[in-house]
């Protein structure tokens, strides 16, 4: 089916203010002459067309610019990927940008949607490294990438006790990806950013077991790792020329005779001890290892991404990623990038007093809040802050509440969204210019 854009109203026969009309084998999307609103209308129209069973389309006309093409693609995408889109001719640079968005967005959405039976912790680490290598190769930067994957008992031997503790209950070994993108080729080059991602490839909740309804989508609990991998790949596509390190903390949280238990105490590399009061608050336990490693690199800034708390989703739904940080300037930079890329982020509170709300009688901190009515997203961030020396500056925590949709909306199909890839790449690039 051919799809065109029009600034004229649809005939009332298609309904008042209809965004779609049809003529033979052609559909017309009716715009409102408002740039942001029109992008949304195009994405909504794409969803409507998919809902009508249309799988193959050709976008026709000079009105199709980069942003309209991208909006249509986002709405037309489904997890089964049983569709085809013929895009109009764009200028070379714009065509490259569109293809890079699709390449990186598809990686993120595809790997999040993938079943846990095929995406083990080690596989996630391998696939992420392979994706970055491929992206670097496309842009003649393959020699800039080096990495290692630490897995199984080697994690415990090297002091990554959080990842090991959470993942040791599964036959699929836990793993940590440590990847260095260094286009300068100078081993002593300063690090612009360290990216730390939660890569829980399946989360049963452990002995604090989830109900079936809550567990059914837990193959997506590696969404933070996927998002940061996609963002780094997209930044490379846009010409990133400074050093960035990626740390993915990968594990399965299952029940077995070897799984961790409530009351266990983890001693981290930096000497902090943490009592496990809920095995379903495992994401922060694995991220701690990554944050310690990231902090030791003395980067200009650190970003961690994780599908960390239900509290963040309760606050903002699936429509925004939640941002928590004490660094107002860095948050401002992030929101500027989000505005430029037309992606939704929302700030949630994180203050010093939250750090006193995760007390333990047996360790330095506990992995859940210790007050009767606590701010779950904020206390989770507070836990993470114990693994960054100067937690008040140059650190962004993103609770990935917009990573995945359990039900479709007028903009998105069921499944992963890819929201955030462009914003985080934009942030890295903008910081690299300062």
Swiss-Prot record:
Highest rank taxon of the organism: Bacteria
Cofactor(s) this protein requires: Mn(2+)
Location, primary (coarse class): cytoplasm
Keywords assigned by UniProt, alphabetized: Aminopeptidase, Cytoplasm, Hydrolase, Manganese, Metal-binding, Protease
Co-factor remark: Binds 2 manganese ions per subunit.
Enzyme Commission number(s) from the entry: 3.4.11.23
Location in the cell: Cytoplasm
GO molecular-function terms, A-Z: manganese ion binding; metalloaminopeptidase activity
Family annotation (Pfam families): DUF3663 (PF12404), Peptidase_M17 (PF00883)
Quaternary structure and partners: Homohexamer.
Family: Belongs to the peptidase M17 family.
Protein name, as recorded: Peptidase B
Organism: Haemophilus influenzae (strain 86-028NP)
